[in-house]
Amino acid sequence: MKLKGRKIVGGKAEGEVIVSRKPLSFLGGVDPETGIVTDAESDIRGQSIAGKILVFPRGKGSTVGSYVIYALKKNNKAPKAIIVGEAETIVATGAIISDIPMVDGVDVSKLKTGMKVRVDADSGEVEILEDGE
């Protein structure tokens, strides 16, 4: 199955999905040294986003969150790609300065943790390769 969205940052990535059903704040919500989600309100608290395809409805929080995404990339703890239901400037800026493929406008309810997907951000497409859990 292919899901259609909109390119925010071009590029391609393939890998395992980790899904948060709640908005995600990077500042204070993700440890830039480890890639572990630390936000007490997050449904993926304690899990690593490093090397995964990160899926969530939208970002929240401070503009400094963009630099947390950049620090994740510099520390080799960033996600391979970001898929959001609705892009906002904090996450989009972080993905742009970190060169992380990003797509928005995707029906994130169709994705679940453990799936394997291919993201073609250039065309705005997300292809589900394996169903996961």
Curated annotation (Swiss-Prot):
Pathway assignment: Isoprenoid biosynthesis; isopentenyl diphosphate biosynthesis via mevalonate pathway
Enzyme Commission identifier(s): 4.2.1.182
Family annotation (Gene3D superfamilies): Phosphohistidine domain
BP terms from Gene Ontology: isopentenyl diphosphate biosynthetic process, mevalonate pathway
CDD domains documented for this protein: AcnX_swivel
Keywords: Isoprene biosynthesis, Lyase
Catalyzed reactions: (R)-5-phosphomevalonate = (2E)-3-methyl-5-phosphooxypent-2-enoate + H2O
Active site: 62
GO molecular function, one term: hydro-lyase activity
EC class (word): lyase
Function: Component of a hydro-lyase that catalyzes the dehydration of mevalonate 5-phosphate (MVA5P) to form trans-anhydromevalonate 5-phosphate (tAHMP). Involved in the archaeal mevalonate (MVA) pathway, which provides fundamental precursors for isoprenoid biosynthesis, such as isopentenyl diphosphate (IPP) and dimethylallyl diphosphate (DMAPP).
Record-linked HAMAP family: PMDh_S
NCBIfam families recorded: PRK03955.1
Assembly information from the UniProt record: Heterodimer composed of a large subunit (PMDh-L) and a small subunit (PMDh-S).
Family per similarity comment: Belongs to the AcnX type II small subunit family.
Protein name: Phosphomevalonate dehydratase small subunit
Organism of this sequence: Thermococcus kodakarensis (strain ATCC BAA-918 / JCM 12380 / KOD1) (Pyrococcus kodakaraensis (strain KOD1))
